[in-house]
């Protein structure tokens, strides 16, 4: 589906810019393809009771950790609802309150790119929920998170809020700052809403 880009339009804090960065070899290996769930709704999943295909269908939101298992699956926490994710985030923010060490005064915004490895045009968002404008709907292919001193996490939503959000994938800034997450087929070019939590 052909998307029209309206040049020069700023939408609620979005800035449309051309990204010219070159990605390192480490960033190129951060393609998010599949998950190995360690916890679902804060309940541990052990090696004997791996998450079944049916249980995976119940997982609505995945928090991706910056580590992979021996098969290349990304370690992750699963959540069956926005409420269980929000409860986890509130607990985790309290635990991290005095443990976040900023990497500098820099990036207070998460950058969303149209191509992998921070390629092509990008938009940035600093705080709060945003349904993407039509020019950016189903267009995001890679993410570079804000500093953990600026905000807690970035969530990509499959649908807009008026469409019920759909599935979500979360990147905690303390884990992902300084790295680029490339979105594989399951998430590439399907994001319709974003949320950067303080």
Regions found by a protein language model. Name each.
Residues 1-25:
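Sec-dependent N-terminal signal peptides of Gram-positive bacterial secreted proteins and lipoproteins
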Residues 10, 25-198:
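Compact beta-sheet-dominated domain cores in extracellular/mature segments
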């Amino acid at each position: 589906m052909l998307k029209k880009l309206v040049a020069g339009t700023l939408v609620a804090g979005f800035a449309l810019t051309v990204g010219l960065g070159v990605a390192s070899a480490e960033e190129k290996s951060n393609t998010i393809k599949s998950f190995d769930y360690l916890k679902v709704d804060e309940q541990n999943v052990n090696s004997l009771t791996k998450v079944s295909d049916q249980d995976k269908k119940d997982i609505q939101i995945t928090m991706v950790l910056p580590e992979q298992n021996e098969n290349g699956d990304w370690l992750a926490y699963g959540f069956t609802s926005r409420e269980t994710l929000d409860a986890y985030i509130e607990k985790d923010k309290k635990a991290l309150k005095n443990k976040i060490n900023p990497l500098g005064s820099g990036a207070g915004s998460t950058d969303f790119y149209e191509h992998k490895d921070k390629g092509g045009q990008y938009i940035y968002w600093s705080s709060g929920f945003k349904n993407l404008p039509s020019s950016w709907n189903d267009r995001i292919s890679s993410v570079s998170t804000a500093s953990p001193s600026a905000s807690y996490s970035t969530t990509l939503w499959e649908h807009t809020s008026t469409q019920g959000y759909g599935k979500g994938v979360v990147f905690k800034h303390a884990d992902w700052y300084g790295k680029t997450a490339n979105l594989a087929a399951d998430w590439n070019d399907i994001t319709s809403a974003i949320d950067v939590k303080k």
